[in-house]
Amino acid sequence: MAARTVLVLGGGVGGLVTANELRRRLDPADRVVVIERERRHLFQASLLWLMVGRRRRDQIERPLRELLAPGVELVEADVRSIDPAARRVETTAGVFTGDALVVALGAEPDRDAVPGYREVALDFFSPEGAAACAGALHTFGGGRVVVAVAALPYKCPAAPYE
């Protein structure tokens, strides 16, 4: 059988686990290629702990390469377009095609979707946001707190309940 190529788009938890499991299960001749824009992997589930001072940023971040199994290829690039039928991906590093395509790009908050969000709302979906939330919690003297989900999908579905 000819060697196959699997393209994994995204180096978050979903992409990382998928790529590492594929590398473990596939024939050694098959290629597993992760395409990710960030050099470092941020374990986003720990942003809550960062926000409340139970972790430091250096404890929840690692070079992505260190987390990939030996034999998993890494392409540092932004994904520009995806043609799922052709299993073709256009990136800032060129065009890639594969025999299979895994899309694990995650969700990004659209802070402009809700008027006034940028001016008054806080979220902990980034280290900077977690730090801003920590500051607000530290100075909070009581009153009402509104927890809102503006639209689906959103990062970390359990977050509003935590």
Spans of model-derived segments:
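FAD-binding core/adjacent interface of flavoenzyme oxidoreductases
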Residues: M1-T5, V72-Y161
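Beta1-alpha1 glycine-rich phosphate/pyrophosphate-binding loop at the start
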Residues: A2-E73, A150-E162
